[in-house]
Amino acid sequence: GDRDLEVYLIHAAEWNVMGHKRMTERSVVLTASESGTTPEVLEAIGKMKEMGVRVYAMTNPEGKIGRAVGAENCVMMASDHGAGGCEKGYYLADCFGLRLLNRRGCFPKFDLFIEQTKDIWKDMLDIRKRFEPRAGELARKYALADYTMFIGSGALWGETVLYSMCLLEEMQWKRIR
């Protein structure tokens, strides 16, 4: 049943140094990279493949990570907000996990879930459009700050790191640490 399916969030840079005592050749790993070139992820994929771990990636199949895992193990990420943008990554990861549960007999309504969520991107775009005026206010207020600190915990920790490191630090060269 679903009680014996263990799920762990592992950061590639940490795993490259410390490993994970529960990872074996029977493990399945899902990673994501919009750029397809994240060095820590590439290093981890190499080590995991040596262990016989099955690695799947949400990335461009023609990028470095896509080539490392094999195109047949890739799902293209969507940079286009109309196609889901960042939220599509969450959706795809959820679908991956739910399909695993489905194949184990723990989520028999997987196909119904997929059918019911197929038009979610239009709604997400409408929500973004409604928030745009408030986003503009926040941007004007904080855009020129010398230093910005982002704090997240629990379920928001990973999203906080993603936003601050990938979007602000790597793409906009903002000092965030």
Language-model regions: role of each:
Residues 1-110:
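Glycine-rich phosphate-binding loops that contact phosphosugars or nucleotide phosphates
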Residues 81-82, 98-177:
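Active-site phosphate/pyrophosphate-binding segments
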